[in-house]
From Swiss-Prot:
This is Nebulin-related-anchoring protein. GO terms for molecular function: actin binding; actin filament binding; metal ion binding; muscle alpha-actinin binding; vinculin binding. Transmembrane segments: none annotated. Nebulin repeats lie at residues 173-200, 201-235, 244-271, 313-340, 345-379, 386-414, 416-450, 484-518, 519-553, 555-589, 599-623, 624-658, 659-689, 699-721, 723-757, 758-792, 794-828, 841-866, 867-893, 898-932, 943-960, 966-1000, 1001-1035, 1037-1071, 1075-1109, 1110-1136, 1141-1175, 1180-1203, 1209-1243, 1244-1278, 1280-1314, 1318-1352, 1353-1379, 1384-1418, 1425-1446, 1452-1478, 1487-1521, 1523-1557, 1561-1595, 1596-1630, 1637-1661. The lineage of its organism: Eukaryota, Metazoa, Chordata, Craniata, Vertebrata. The modification Phosphoserine is found at residue 1078. The modification Phosphothreonine is found at residue 203. The gene is Nrap. Interacts with actin, alpha-actinin, KLHL41, TLN1 and VCL. Interacts with CSRP3. Residues 4-64 form the LIM zinc-binding domain. Expressed in cardiac and skeletal muscle. Not detected in kidney, spleen, liver, brain, lung, stomach or uterus. GO terms for biological process: actin cytoskeleton organization. May be involved in anchoring the terminal actin filaments in the myofibril to the membrane and in transmitting tension from the myofibrils to the extracellular matrix. GO terms for cellular component: fascia adherens; muscle tendon junction; myofibril; Z disc. Keywords: Actin-binding, LIM domain, Metal-binding, Phosphoprotein, Repeat, Zinc.
Length: 1728
């Protein structure tokens, strides 16, 4: 901002106080009259010589010489009359009672004025020092003491001398003395007369008070000493103004000048002591002379001193004020009325900044005053409108009006000069005359500039005081309970939640789809459509199976260096635990550029380890946790819970429209009848594996890794105790995923079925012909026959051939030394970023350094979070995008970028190769679909890279042995989340509540299929039929083998119950959730940052009132909607809510039930209504649900984990969910309440006897009959049964014993206290909402009061994305919908899927059902030997703690006969079998006669020579004997040196230190992040500065929606979730015939993952172009044509490279062998 200087004071002028007049810039306070100093405005000033004047003092009008009736002349006239003897005495007598003019005070004022004489002080001071060295005290103390004496006792002594003489002539009256002094002052001659004589009359006497005071005044007047003291005192400000010497002098001078005190002293000491003897006139004259001399010196001194006049010294100001304060009360009143004109220095205490500041400092020093004002001042900030400067200006502006000025002049001054000589108005006129002096004005003005003309907040002592405020004991030690909470609406979590809500909005998704779906027009004769039709024929499953059967059993030759054998070796190395961990150590540390979760975790753990900090911030921070409900692990936990829990197994099925004879209906009847534990478990056993988490699966490993990373024990223990953890996103796991996707027969056939019916192509289409040619090329029969032909022919292979060169290049790529050499060369190339924020690694290092400083972290969080802006086209971002495209399979088929380069350019070739090598995923994917096997060749680039990366990030090599890791339980693991969800689902109240809600929300017709189904179900539930069937089953008996499903299930459950296996799986699962790019992307880190900001006590209380009204939370956010929905499901509140108004028939069943529900107002009646349903959701011990809870209890059992619970005392927390559940259970099971409620309900309810509910109630009553129960119990007891120690009831009792342990409960409660934190407020946490709602529901009044108001406040659109997804997931994961009616599809009657559906509906018996399942085995079931299962097993073995630690001798060998490895080994053995090879070759020996000079035969001989081991050894011996030159600068030597330097830790640190300071060259400090960081750290070292700036900067957060953190979060969300998978592509304006548009149309069809992978499988052989294919022949033909047209020999020498470039350009993604063969053809052509 351009600030101009004021024309008067020279200081900067800000817009708020700016006036532009007379071509100059002024302050409002500086724009005043040059004569009277009255403040002017732009409308009432007069300009003269570019200076402002008022109208009264306009120099053009006021050029007068003399006026007779001036106040001075009138005063002289009155004075002459006053000296007239009797009249003077008569006038003097009444005056004595009005005002006693104190001559001693006048002399004192003159003495005070003489104190400012600089020349008199220093000689006396020096003489005093020499006269009494060391005896003089501090000059300040001497001055104060002597001033008191000279103005006190000295005055009374002189007064007593005068009074004791007895005479009181008129000449010594105050009126006479004043008139005489005024006459002398008015005379210029008298003024200057006697100056030299007076100078010589003053002979310093060392011990006179006047001399000492003059010395002190001279010292104060000294310009050098004054400025020194001012500089020393400028920044202190922390001591009150009352203890300064200037304040003491002013106070003393005020007391001396006080009219009241003067009268008191006069009546006490002087009255009655007057003497008639005349006073000495010389003394009066001498006093007058002294006053004149001092006045002249006072006037002359400032004129020669320039910009620092003596009038601004404190001594002069005090003396001046003492002289001006002689007036009485009325004068002061008038003075206060006129003070706005020029009296800046005499404001009231409320408006005087100095006094106000002094009072404020005194209050701040006082702890009592500070504590009293703390609550009033904590929410305020400095405002310019509240500063004394603004108030002064506003008050002064009242007096600057010309109208009011003239009004006061007319009423108070004009015409009032006549009167007594001592008239107060005349005194006021004299006062104004003295104020009109320019010198005096400027002295006051300079003083005012110091006090008023800059912001009060910028004063040094104000800054010092404000810095001391947070350090007060009150602020520092106050209780955390007094702090209030305020929510910030612009936090990254809320912003991210808004963005997620917009992205997850089904309306937005459908809107974009509706806009885009009509933008495509596809003509019928489009080449893509024709090609699709041709592909439809190629995709025929019949032809596919026919070709597969033909080629399946023919076998093929495999050499020892074949890719399959190399892949087997590589897989052997992959399976090696040692090599895997070695690669893991190498790979560790590559994930640079992301936020360091471990470092942030260490900071978080340090905070959490403080018990005080934990207790202080728990209540505030527990509501700030924001967890998006569509996270991968949560969805996985939900699905796993739905599969693993028994809750929904026997739940009453929802109402679906199915036929009564439907197989699913029969199955539901059977499921409801399964009450025997054996039958129940047998039924569960065949479903084993459906919802079970495979040990070692990707999700488990990720969760285990995340737990390990945030484990406090792992972090704090010694480095040599860390265990080994597996990385879930390693190359092996990714490879297993890709292999599973490629080999998935279901996806392959599903995609084939869809595309079979969608394409039509003409037979003579070129694309169709080419597809036929490709089909011929892809034929395995033709391939093997051509391969046999080529193998028999042989070919020429020279040492400089492409194959050898390629092998060497691959060897160099696989060489670790060369890899490191290339890495070291390329390490510093990515430079050129504009700032450190542009470089991800530098930004990461800077962020780490900031995070390590707790002060920096707290201080700069709110200010710096809006200062990150990264341009999207920076190098590392572009590189990250390209790497992302290369690493994912999404952009695999996108068209390459368009480059303008010559085809023969070597850079183009190298760039193509580099692009293929840079992407690890693309490289492997390319290898996989080219090879067709899914294996990675040993020694390839990505294998070596993976090994190297594993070695680099190996925890074992980097730090320690993994044996010593201990177990730490994490509350938010999938197991714990699953346990919580299981608990929620197992609550009996919620189950019944949901049933009641469902029961009252539909209207049914009597003949609906649902009603018929309900009748059938009622028959199935019949107690009589149940007992009959049970008796028949029981009498028939059954056979139970050792391999029966119940036994197998028991074995599996025993493994599940194993605590050791759980902890082993937990250790593997910890730490997977890593890799967030910034703090905002990581929930834990964002929560830690937010929690730390909340831990600031002062900061929290300071901004609460100001920020609590800024909270805005859209009600349609995903988390809120989900929380509302979850609350309605989880709470009991809506159970008795009045139902929303629906239009129903009067006889509707639901209306009757609703009436009954509204009558249930008594709690007893309410519970009695629940009691009739007792036993319906009864859980049988030993079920999956109970076992899961047992397992959860054992997992969190502290006694098993750490210590015995007997040493802990019991303290119950009454409001926990468990206790609340126990209370409710106790109330529900209360027999007295049950019967009382039953009596009440019996007289208030009438029900139809034929209702299914009534029949079910009768059935339940029969089931709950005590007599029948005891009878059945006695029958069972008489039969007896076998109960072993390891039986499930015993296991359940043990688990329940652990659950009932109060110590475990207390311990888990304490451990869990700080875990559930991070939601932004209570409304975001469903559990907290549930607890609050439970508290409200316990009050019957609260319940009835809130019932009507809250019933209509929940709106949840049923088509929201996550709800739809949850429904689909539920339908897929549960057995619930298995028998539901299939959705309606439009399919042909002869469609294969239609026939299959009919067949599935016909399966009604369990035998046929399971037999049909056996027929479908492999379709939706994971095969035991599938790559996914095998990779999971292998991963489990690799990270198995048991297998890792035990000796190899103890490992038993079990081989799987049909494993891929053995099958592959068998086939390899058959291929490598010499007998079989020769046997097959013998038949062809007699059928072929080669020409001896045939080129192929000749080439075979040459190849035999090349491949001969004997010839090879002879050549080696010859070359070795010949020797060769190997210099010191050879590449191997250089490579060895570089690799040694790379491996040297010292060299690494040395390079790091050299590299640290190279980022120089910034234009300014603001461009250098480190310098800016240091400056900011310097400011932030002051805690006061941080807290003061916090409130100002808290609302300045601005986060761009397109910043990389948000974009990365969006992309990560898109990759991790299935929500946006099918989102339509953005609209582009492109040619309809453009290849990209055609590809986009094709991509829009690939909406499911199955179709996508099936499409990949369909095209597995398309991109692989074997020799002699259409592309190769076309390239060869083009090369030959170009060769013919080439210019002679030169063209021939250039053409091979061009042809190679052309071929490579046309066949990017083609098998490199085709390119090599093409080059061989070209070389042979050239040689010929």
């Amino acid at each position: 901002m351009n600030v101009q200087a004021c024309s008067r004071c020279g200081y900067g002028v800000y817009p708020a106080e700016k006036i532009s007049c007379i071509d100059q810039t002024w302050h409002k306070a500086c724009f005043h009259c040059e004569v009277c100093k009255m403040m002017l405005s732009v409308n009432n000033f007069v300009s003269h010589q570019k200076k402002p004047y008022c109208h009264a003092h306009n120099p053009k009008n006021n050029t007068f010489t003399s006026v007779y009736h001036t106040p001075l002349n009138l005063t002289l006239k009155k004075s002459v009359a006053a000296m007239g003897g009797i009249d003077g005495k008569e006038d003097g007598e009444p005056f004595k009672s009005v005002l006693h003019w104190d001559m001693k005070s006048k002399a004192g004022a003159g003495a005070a004025s003489r104190l400012m004489n600089e020349r008199d002080y220093w000689p006396g001071y020096a003489e005093g020092n020499t006269w009494c060295p060391g005896a003089l005290p501090d000059p300040e103390i001497v001055r104060m003491v002597e001033a008191r004496q000279s103005l006190g006792e000295g005055y009374t002594e002189d007064r007593e001398q005068q009074q004791g003489k007895g005479s009181f002539p008129a000449m010594i009256t105050p009126a006479y003395q004043r008139a005489k002094a005024a006459n002398q002052l008015a005379s210029q001659v008298q003024y200057k007369r006697g100056h030299d004589e007076r100078v010589s009359t003053f002979t310093p006497v060392a011990d006179t008070p006047e001399l000492l005071r003059a010395k002190a005044g001279g010292q104060l007047q000294n310009d050098v000493r004054y400025t020194e003291d001012g500089g020393q005192q400028r920044g202190k400000g922390s001591f009150p103004a009352m203890i300064t010497p200037a304040y003491q002098i002013a106070k003393r001078a005020t007391e001396l000048a006080s009219d009241v005190r003067y009268h008191q002293q006069y009546h006490r000491e002087m009255k009655g002591m007057a003497s008639p003897v005349g006073a000495e006139g010389g003394m009066t004259k001498d006093s007058v002379d002294r006053c004149g001399q001092v006045y002249s010196e006072e006037c002359d001194e400032p004129r020669g001193k320039g910009s620092f006049p003596a009038m601004i010294t404190p001594a002069y100001q005090n003396a001046k004020k003492a002289n001006e304060l002689v007036s009485d009360i009325k004068y002061r009143q008038d003075f206060h009325k006129m003070k706005g004109a020029a009296h800046f220095h005499s404001l009231a205490a409320q408006d005087n900044l100095v006094l106000k500041r002094a009072q404020s400092v005194s209050k701040l020093v006082s702890e009592v005053e500070y504590k009293k004002g703390l609550e009033n001042s904590k929410g305020h900030s400095i405002n310019y409108c509240e500063t004394p400067q603004f108030r002064n200006v506003s008050k002064i502006s009242k007096f600057t009006s010309d109208n009011k000025y003239k009004e006061n002049y007319q009423t108070q001054l004009r015409g009032h000069y006549d009167g007594v000589g001592m008239d107060r108005r005349m005194l006021h006129a004299l006062k104004v005359g003295s104020l009109a002096s320019n010198v005096a004005y400027k002295a006051d003005y300079k003083h005012d500039v110091v006090d008023y003309n800059y912001l009060a907040t910028a004063t040094p002592f104000y800054q010092t005081t404000m810095r001391l405020v947070p350090l007060k004991d009150v602020n520092y030690r106050q209780n955390i309970d007094r702090m209030k909470f305020s929510s910030v609406t612009n936090t990254p979590q809320i912003v991210q939640a808004k963005i997620n809500a917009q992205q997850l909005s089904h309306v937005n998704y459908r809107a974009d789809y509706e806009r885009n779906k009509l933008n495509y027009t596809l003509p019928q004769d489009a080449p893509q459509l024709l090609k699709a039709k041709a592909n439809a024929e190629l995709f025929s499953e019949v032809k596919y199976k026919e070709g597969w059967q033909k080629t399946k059993g023919k076998g093929f030759e495999m050499k020892l260096d074949a890719m399959s054998l190399l892949a087997a070796k590589a897989s052997g190395e992959l399976a090696s635990s040692v090599k895997y961990k070695e690669e893991y150590e190498k790979m560790k540390g590559r994930a640079l550029g992301a936020t360091d979760s471990k470092l942030l975790h260490s900071l978080q753990v340090a905070k959490m380890s403080s018990e005080v900090e934990y207790k202080k911030g728990f209540e505030e921070s527990k509501t700030h946790f924001n967890l998006p409900m569509d996270m991968v692990n949560l969805r996985h936990a939900k699905k796993a819970q739905a599969l693993a829990s028994d809750l929904d197994y026997r739940k009453k099925l929802h109402d679906y429209t199915v036929l009564p004879e439907d197989m699913k209906t029969q199955w539901a009847k059977k499921a409801y009848g399964l009450q025997s534990e054996l039958q129940y478990k047998a039924d569960l056993a065949w479903m084993r594996g459906v919802g079970w988490l495979t040990e070692g699966s990707l999700n488990l490993e990720q969760a285990k890794k995340a737990g390990q990373l945030i484990s406090e024990k792992n972090y704090r223990q010694r480095v040599d105790e860390l265990k080994f953890t597996s990385v879930a996103d390693s190359s092996q796991m990714e490879h297993a995923k890709k292999s599973q996707g490629l080999q998935n027969a279901v996806a392959y056939k599903a995609g084939n079925e869809q595309s079979v019916h969608q394409y039509t192509i003409s037979k003579d289409e070129p694309l169709f012909l080419r597809a036929r040619a490709n089909a011929a090329q892809l034929s395995e029969t033709l391939y093997k026959s051509s391969w046999e032909k080529q193998k028999a022919k042989g070919f020429e292979l020279r040492l400089d051939s492409l194959a050898f060169l390629t092998a060497k290049a691959k060897r160099d790529l696989a060489s670790e030394v060369k890899y490191k050499e290339d890495y070291e060369r390329s390490r510093g190339k990515l430079i050129g970023a504009k700032s450190a924020q542009g470089d991800s690694q530098m930004s990461h290092s800077l962020q780490m350094s900031k995070l390590q400083s707790d002060l920096e972290y707290k201080k700069g969080f709110e200010d710096t979070r809006s200062q990150c802006h990264i341009s999207l086209d920076m190098v590392h971002l572009v590189h990250a995008r390209q790497a992302q495209h290369l690493a994912t399979d999404v952009g695999y088929r996108t068209a390459s970028h368009c480059f303008t380069a010559l085809p023969t350019d070597m850079k183009v070739e190298w760039a193509k190769k580099a692009y293929g090598l840079q992407s690890d995923n693309q490289y492997r994917a390319d290898m996989k679909w080219m090879k067709g096997t899914g294996w990675v060749a040993t020694g390839s680039l990505h294998v070596e890279q993976a090994k190297k990366a594993g070695e680099l990030i190996s925890e074992k090599k980097y730090r320690q042995h993994p044996d010593a890791l201990k177990f730490t339980s994490i509350k938010d693991t999938p197991e714990m989340v699953q346990a919580r969800i299981s608990y929620t689902q197992a609550v009996d109240r919620l189950y019944r509540e949901q049933g009641e809600n469902v029961k009252h929300h539909y209207t049914q017709t009597a003949d609906l299929p649902e009603v018929l189904l309900a009748k059938l179900n009622a028959m199935n539930i019949s107690e009589t039929r149940y007992k009959e069937s049970w008796s028949r089953l029981r009498d028939g008996g059954y056979k139970l083998r050792l391999d029966a499903l119940p036994f197998q299930a028991a074995k599996a459950s025993s493994e599940v119950i194993s605590d050791y296996k759980y902890k082993e799986a937990f250790e593997r699962m910890k730490g997977q959730m890593l890799g967030s790019r910034s703090l905002e992307d990581d929930l834990s880190l964002a929560h830690s940052v937010h929690a730390t900001s909340l831990q600031s006590d002062v900061n929290y209380k300071k901004g609460f009132e100001h920020a609590k009204a800024h909270f805005h939370l859209p009600l349609d956010m995903v988390t809120l909607v989900h929380a509302k929905k979850a609350q309605t499901l989880a709470s009991d509140q809506d159970y008795r809510h009045p139902l929303p108004q629906h239009t129903v028939l009067a006889e509707d069943l639901r209306l009757s039930c609703a009436k009954k529900a509204h009558k249930l107002q008594s709690e007893n009646l309410y519970r009695s209504d629940l009691n009739f349903m007792r036993g319906v959701p009864c859980v049988v011990p030993g079920t999956l649900e109970i076992e899961g809870r047992k397992k959860a209890s054992e997992l969190i059992s502290e006694s098993k984990y750490r210590q015995h619970p007997g040493s802990f005392k019991y303290t119950a927390v009454t409001d926990t969910p468990n206790l609340l559940h126990a209370k409710y259970s106790n109330q529900i099971t209360n027999e007295r309440l049950y019967k009382a409620a039953g009596e009440d309900a019996r007289h208030q309810y009438t029900m139809t006897l034929g209702l299914p509910e009534f029949i079910r109630a009768k059935t339940n009553a029969a089931n709950l009959s005590e007599a029948k129960y005891k009878e059945a119990w006695h029958n069972l007891r008489a039969q007896g049964y076998k109960l072993t120690i390891d039986a499930l009831p015993f296991q359940a009792a043990r688990a329940s014993g652990d659950i009932a342990s109060d110590f475990l409960y207390r311990h888990e409660f304490v451990k869990e206290r700080g875990q559930l934190i991070g939601v932004r407020n209570v409304s975001d946490d469903p559990r907290l909402l549930h607890c609050l709602r439970m508290g409200q529901l316990q009050s019957e009044n609260q319940y009835r009061k809130e019932a009507a108001s809250s019933q209509a406040q929940c709106h949840l659109p049923m088509d929201m994305m996550y709800l739809v997804h949850a429904r689909k997931a539920q339908a897929l994961a549960s057995d619930h919908d298995y028998r539901t009616q299939c959705h309606e599809f439009t399919a042909l009657p002869e469609d294969l899927k239609m026939a299959w559906a009919k067949k599935a509906h016909a399966l009604q018996s369990e035998f046929r059902y399971k037999a049909d399942l056996m027929g479908m085995k492999g379709t939706g079931w994971l095969a035991l030997q599938s790559p996914q299962i095998e990779s999971a097993k292998k991963a489990g073995d690799l990270i198995s703690e048991t297998k890792y630690r035990k000796k190899p001798d103890s490992i038993k060998f079990t081989t799987v006969v049909d494993s891929p490895d053995l099958i592959h080994a068998k086939e390899s053995y058959m291929h490598c079998n010499e007998r079989l090879y020769r046997l097959g070759d013998a038949a062809s020996l007699h059928r072929y006669t080669p020409i001896p000079d045939h080129p192929d035969f000749t080439r075979a001989r040459m190849n035999a020579m090349h491949l001969s081991d004997k010839v090879y050894r002879n050549a080696w011996e010859q070359s070795r004997a010949g020797g060769y030159d190997f210099r010191l600068d050879a590449i191997p030597f250089q490579t060895a040196r570089v690799s040694r330097d790379i491996a040297s830790d010292f060299r690494y640190k040395e390079a790091f230190l050299r590299d640290r300071g190279l980022q120089i060259g910034y234009r300014s400090i603001s461009d250098d992040p480190r310098t800016t960081h240091f400056l900011r750290v310097g400011r932030l070292q002051s805690d006061n500065e941080y807290r003061k700036a916090f409130a100002k900067g808290r609302s300045q957060f601005h986060s761009r929606a397109d910043q990389p953190g948000f974009l990365q979060a969006k992309r990560s969300q898109q990759l991790a979730s299935d929500v946006l998978y099918r989102q339509p592509l953005p609209q582009h304006t492109s040619d309809p015939e453009q290849l990209g548009l055609k590809h986009a149309r094709k991509a829009h069809q690939l909406q499911s993952d199955v179709k996508y992978k099936s499409d990949l499988n369909l095209t597995r052989g398309v991109g692989w172009t074997p020799p002699g294919s259409y592309k190769v022949e076309m390239a060869r033909r083009a090369a030959e044509l170009a060769n013919r047209r080439g210019p002679g020999i030169r063209g021939a020498s250039v053409e091979p490279e061009a042809a190679a470039a052309l071929g490579d350009h046309q066949s990017r993604g083609v098998n490199p062998d085709a390119s090599e063969i093409l080059h061989i053809h070209k070389k042979k052509t050239l040689l010929m």
